[in-house]
UniProtKB/Swiss-Prot annotation:
Protein keywords: Chloroplast, mRNA processing, Plastid, RNA-binding, tRNA processing
GO annotation (BP), single: RNA splicing
Species assigned in the record: Portulacaria afra (Elephant's food)
Stored Pfam families: Intron_maturas2, MatK_N
Localization per record: Plastid, Chloroplast
Identification of the protein by name: Maturase K
Length: 505
């Protein structure tokens, strides 16, 4: 925190979220550059200047000139900035990254200040940062629930909606106007441009705007859930200090969009067992209620997005499923509630009884077809799952080739270790091992059989995870305890993102 404040003075203007002066500070773009390389906001050396501040000022000045706006809107190839189209795109990207750094600052400071003096709570909630922590929650809660809503959160049809959401937090009109100018100059806020184009070219800024937009929606949604439930949910980092949220809440009550009495809305959705989980653009709303209650939630969410956030969502983007009959497609797994029957023989004196027990079990299965498709797209196998050589890596050193394949295999094994059925995971390992062997054999102009015979067991050890190596040293592979550990689901509390090959959404 002190290191961060060394670069940014928190004076009175900053306390009111005035960002415009920061746009002309060169170290802001150094932060953005360093974050792109090292995934770190702060620079080790603040004097290492990555960009030219003069070029940034020139570009911002031209953005305010009407002639330049006309040229940008018409997609003209003449009179490109600095005479080179790729340089213009470079500095547009540079300003985009700078904007993202600037707007992230107040929310980072807000989160840090709100957690000061709460070290014990931070330690307790540290493991919740892992996306794997969602699945133990499913195992604990979903066994007692009946229905689930699988929700695809709609994207805004216009980037202006994302910018307007910032007005509740950012009071600097100049910064907001400049952000709009930037989007117009880059031909992003136009009917002919898709929002997906912006998200690919300006990932960091788009992700911030979109996540902030979803945070605003979830703030009101969590409030409604709290009012309709006997149990109060716990607020975490993205729901802290909702000063402006309560202002919007008053507006929501005054409008009375769906009924004359706000309490009637809450009575319609009275449910003491309601659970909500979201990852990226997909969320799950699970309940112990009836099918009628879930249909009410479905159409309420559709009208809620449309009336208060200008988001058009079609009913088919929200699926209502019964947990006992359908599987959840979430975060690379098919999750379902399975019934396990067991017969127990009980002997009492001269009488014997057969007791049939049915136990619910939360089951997780790897989505093997999309994962094999991702491996085929990355040229590790064909569309049928048959391993092939990675020709683009054939010029690397042998150690680098083995290290790359081994790292991918370990990462996927680490993430999919929670699967209840390991057969699909073994298939993925087989594809990567044989693809690695064929790549090395192609490099040395040899056969796979001869190459594997030369390397022996040392080659296979590169594809083992650290946990598998430790277990193999402590327990024999054929022991009952070892088989139980290898076959059972294992959830890790240090996974903060999904591997690119596993993320096929």
């Amino acid at each position: 925190m002190e290191f961060f404040q060394r670069y940014i003075e928190l004076d009175r203007s900053w306390q009111h979220n005035f960002f415009y002066p920061l746009i002309f500070q060169e170290y802001i773009y150094g932060f953005a550059y360093d974050h792109g390389l090292n995934k770190s906001i702060l620079l080790e050396n603040a004097d290492d200047k990555k960009y030219s501040l003069l070029i940034v000022k020139r570009l911002i000045t031209r953005m305010y000139q009407q002639n330049h706006l006309i040229l940008a809107a018409n997609n003209s190839n003449q009179n490109d900035f600095l005479g080179h189209k790729h340089k213009k795109n470079l500095y547009y990207q540079m300003i985009s990254e700078g904007f993202a750094v600037i707007v992230e600052i107040p929310f980072s400071l807000l989160l840090i200040s709100s957690l000061e003096g709460k070290e014990k709570k931070i330690v307790k909630s540290h493991n919740l940062r892992s996306i794997h922590s969602v699945f133990p929650f499913f195992e604990d809660k979903f066994l007692h629930l009946n229905y689930v809503l699988e929700i695809l959160i709609p994207y805004p049809i216009h980037l202006e909606i994302l910018v307007q959401t910032l007005r509740y937090w950012v009071k600097d009109a100049s910064a907001l106007h400049l952000l709009r100018f930037f989007l117009y100059c880059n031909s992003l806020i136009t009917p002919s441009k898709s929002i997906s184009i912006f998200s690919k070219r300006n990932q960091r800024l788009f992700l911030f705007l979109y996540n902030f937009h979803v945070c605003e929606y979830e703030s009101i949604f969590v409030f409604l859930c709290n009012q309709s439930s006997h149990l109060r949910s716990t607020s975490f980092g993205d729901l802290l200090q909702r000063i402006y949220f309560y202002g919007k809440l008053e507006y929501l009550v005054k409008v009375k969009t769906f009924t004359k009495d706000f309490r009637i809305i809450l009575w319609l959705f009275k449910d003491p067992f309601l659970h909500y989980v979201r990852y990226r653009g997909k969320s799950i709303l699970a309940s112990k209620g009836t099918s009628l209650l879930m249909h009410k939630w479905k159409y309420y969410l559709i009208h809620f997005w449309q009336c208060h956030f200008s988001l058009w969502s079609q009913p088919r983007r929200i699926y209502i499923n019964r947990l006992s009959k359908h599987s959840l497609d979430f975060m690379g797994f098919f999750s379902s509630v399975r019934l396990n029957s067991s017969v127990v023989r009980s002997q009492m004196v001269e009488n014997a009884f057969l007791i049939d027990n049915t136990i619910k079990k939360f089951d997780t299965i790897i989505r093997i077809i999309p994962l094999v498709g991702s491996l085929a797209k990355a040229k590790f196998c064909n569309v049928l799952g048959h391993p092939i050589s990675k020709s683009v890596w054939a010029d690397l050193l042998d150690s680098d080739i083995i290290d790359r394949f081994g790292r991918i295999c370990r990462n996927l094994s680490h993430y999919y270790s929670g699967s209840s059925r390991k057969k699909s995971l073994y298939r993925i390992k087989y594809i990567l091992r044989l693809s690695c062997a064929r790549t090395l054999a192609r490099k040395h102009k040899s056969t796979v059989r001869a190459f594997l015979k030369t390397l022996g067991s040392e080659f296979l050890e590169e594809f083992f995870t650290e946990e598998e190596k430790v277990l193999s040293l402590i327990l024999p592979r054929d022991s009952s305890i070892s088989r139980g550990l290898y076959r059972g689901p294992i959830w890790y509390l240090d996974i903060i993102c999904i591997h690119d090959l596993a993320n096929d959404d």
